[in-house]
Amino acid sequence: MTTRREFLKTGLAGGLLLNLAACARPLENGGRTVVLNALIPVMLTGALPADGNARPELIARTRSGVERAIAGLAPATQKEIGELFDLLAFPPTRMLAAGIWSPWPEATPAAIGNFLESWRHSRFDLLKSGYAALHDLIFGAWYARPDTW
């Protein structure tokens, strides 16, 4: 049985870890570029061309669309999305919450797919909401362009 002291220690440690993640935020957009470069090809499997010169450009345009979509959200929602990307970009929380042990550029499509499926079907609503946010941002940015229809 967890004691009150253990509960408080765990809460403080978790809060400290999240604050460290915010302080360690990369200079660019909170690590979103690196995370999105890894997630977009996995989430858009079947829609993106498998190979070819167009693939990197389509990923970059989708990432740009995600950034535009985030910029159009309410400030409170932008903050929550920023916290989601902080969680995924900061190595200790990425490892614990997503189970991705290698840096995003080195993560395999299978590992990323497993992470996404685990969040999609999680028993925790917070993880399901995180998956839904990633899904909606990426698919919204992809299908907002007429050339993807």
Model-derived features: positions:
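N-terminal secretory signal peptides and thylakoid transit peptides that target proteins
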Residues: M1-L18
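Ser/Thr/Pro/Gly-rich low-complexity linker/stalk segments immediately outside membranes or between
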Residues: P26-N29
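Flexible, low-complexity segments enriched for small/polar residues
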Residues: G31-A141
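Short, functional C-terminal segments
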Residues: A144-W149
